Amino acid sequence: MAKEKFNRTKPHVNIGTIGHVDHGKTTLSAAISAVLSLKGLAEMKDYDNIDNAPEEKERGITIATSHIEYETENRHYAHVDCPGHADYVKNMITGAAQMDGAILVVSAADGPMPQTREHILLSRQVGVPHIVVFLNKQDMVDDQELLELVEMEVRELLSAYEFPGDDTPIVAGSALRALEEAKAGNVGEWGEKVLKLMAEVDAYIPTPERDTEKTFLMPVEDVFSIAGRGTVVTGRIERGVVKVGDEVEIVGIRATQKTTVTGVEMFRKELEKGEAGDNVGVLLRGTKKEEVERGMVLCKPGSITPHKKFEGEIYVLSKEEGGRHTPFFTNYRPQFYVRTTDVTGSITLPEGVEMVMPGDNVKITVELISPVALELGTKFAIREGGRTVGAGVVSNIIE
């Protein structure tokens, strides 16, 4: 048992393990919790406990994910681990478990494998900002030169996907050996390597900006007219803070408009300010009810712009998940549900990709019929006749 209760005053960071199947992601997750539990900073979670991940539904997509939590001297971490490759793909694309950074696990005995590459690419596409590497199974490699060769390969692979390969911290060790030591009740030479890894994670992955510190953005859910007071726009504040007197822009669907906030209320009570996570009504000066509609966003002026054409990384639901039963081709025209509204758009598949089958993940180019407030990392659902057939994230804005 942990000796003390979790201390919530430490900065909180979300991380996860990524990498090829059987390279030791789950063993490492168990080893981290085991080694830190000896320091009273975590509760020991067994491998089986993590590997039998409960299935969760995120926008109708079934994802198996394990969540563990632990602390280092400096931080509190929430850590996600997925049992299967498909679960990782779905997790990263839907943002079910947002990651501020990732630990890439590569077997020193095998070197980078296809899913190593795919997880690095996905991290780049979906905006996982920082990666630290653990070269696992070091106990199976007698040749120091081989270890250095694998390290070089990993650095080159990271650089190929625009991560700073040369500056990425890489720690070698053995998750299994560290776990065995910790179960015997001590932090030995292998446990020290896990602590070294966590020290690198502490130092290299920055503490994320809190949602309230970001620029203000609120998707519009509904619009009302209040006699004598003007137009009220309601929604849940996605990020930032809004207060009376703030200038805001209304972006999306039509030409961008500027206005001033004259009131912020929650449950009919006046608030000094609304902040990320609050469901509020925002009163706008001189704005007519018919000028605002669901699907637009209120935001800090200049912080987000409307776009029609973008590239996205998508996961297409399988038939079992309630998705399509048949593939789709270029020029497929579904609805793209962004934040609070559906907008029709047409899909262009990459060169050399004839069609996309249910259960696949692919990069697509989308052209919407009307502009929507978009930025890198904006999540969307793909819908057809009201049912979700895919999920995606904006990876590049074209126009």
Curated annotation (Swiss-Prot):
Region (G2): 60-64
Keywords linked to the UniProt accession: Cytoplasm, Elongation factor, GTP-binding, Hydrolase, Magnesium, Metal-binding, Nucleotide-binding, Protein biosynthesis
Binding site for Mg(2+): 26
Sites where the protein binds GTP: 19-26, 81-85, 136-139
Reactions that this protein is recorded to catalyse: GTP + H2O = GDP + phosphate + H(+)
Residue ranges of the region described as G5: 174-176
Region (G1): 19-26
Main location: cytoplasm
GO cellular component: cytosol
Gene Ontology MF terms in the entry: GTP binding; GTPase activity; translation elongation factor activity
Domain tr-type G stretches: 10-209
Family: Belongs to the TRAFAC class translation factor GTPase superfamily. Classic translation factor GTPase family. EF-Tu/EF-1A subfamily.
Subunit structure, as described in the record: Monomer.
Functional note: GTP hydrolase that promotes the GTP-dependent binding of aminoacyl-tRNA to the A-site of ribosomes during protein biosynthesis.
The protein's name in its UniProt record: Elongation factor Tu
Species the sequence originates in: Helicobacter pylori (strain Shi470)
